[in-house]
Regions:
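Membrane-proximal helix-loop-helix units in multi-pass membrane proteins
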Residues: 83-136
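Juxtamembrane helix-capping/reentrant segments at transmembrane boundaries
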Residues: 56-77
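Short, hydrophobic transmembrane alpha-helix segments
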Residues: 16-29
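Core segments of transmembrane alpha-helices
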Residues: 7-14, 72-90, 133-142
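Hydrophobic alpha-helical transmembrane segments in multi-pass integral membrane proteins
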Residues: 136-156
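Small-residue-rich transmembrane alpha-helices that serve as helix-helix interface/gating elements
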Residues: 156-175
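Short, highly charged, low-complexity non-transmembrane loops/tails of multi-pass membrane proteins
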Residues: 181-200
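Loop-to-helix transition at the N-terminal end of transmembrane alpha-helices
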Residues: 26-43
Length: 200
């Protein structure tokens, strides 16, 4: 399976179509397109250049061997999650601002988790595969939320429930990934995480 390549082609096609046929984009639509592009770079940094992020997760979190087919398939699940996080706000974000807060929260989460991963995953250098693009995502996520707040876009409930939209989508993605791995549940993962932190 060429999940990463398929995701890249589809995402770039969408970005190209937007550039060709939509003359004026709102700030929120520009943000959605920008995040889509960032996610392409992030997936390649995690998976190929330099790559190795899945191997670190496999070793330190799952603590079990995964075949290459499962690894590649997991990226397809991740790609679907990213499509939801970028396409939905592109079309509906101006009407329902919480759909913008959700991917912004996702961007912030990515930036934080990759920094935490430096210590948790025990990397030899202060770097985890995907760190550079993740920090750009973090800045972008904070930036759009600040812009929305300053320009009074959305109500309090958009900022309150937007992160929960992200969490709901993220949990669905994780449950799908756990089902693909098979034989491992959240309790096992949490136990592995606790043991890993206890060993630090």
């Amino acid at each position: 399976m060429y999940a990463l390549e398929i995701y890249t082609v589809i995402a770039m096609l969408l970005i190209t179509l937007v550039a060709m046929f939509m003359n004026e984009l709102t700030v929120i639509q520009q943000f959605a397109v920008w995040v889509s592009f960032l996610c392409i770079l992030h997936e390649w940094e995690e998976g190929r250049y330099p790559g190795g992020f899945l191997d670190l997760i496999q070793k330190n979190v799952l603590q079990r061997d995964l075949d290459e087919e499962t690894k590649k398939g997991s990226r397809l699940v991740t790609a679907v999650f990213i499509y939801v996080m970028t396409i939905v706000p592109f079309f509906f974000g101006d009407q329902i601002p919480m759909f913008v807060v959700a991917p912004a929260t996702f961007c912030i989460f990515e930036g934080i988790i990759h920094v935490v991963g430096i210590k948790f995953l025990g990397t030899k250098k202060p770097y985890t595969p995907g760190l550079v693009t993740a920090e750009i995502e973090l800045v972008s996520g904070v930036g759009i939320i600040v812009w929305m707040a300053v320009n009074h876009v959305g109500a309090w409930y958009d900022y309150t429930f937007g992160p929960f939209v992200f969490i709901a989508c993220f949990v669905c993605m994780q449950r799908t990934l756990m089902a693909m791995v098979g034989g491992i549940g959240y309790k096992d993962v949490l136990a592995n995480v606790r043991r890993r932190f206890a060993a630090k």
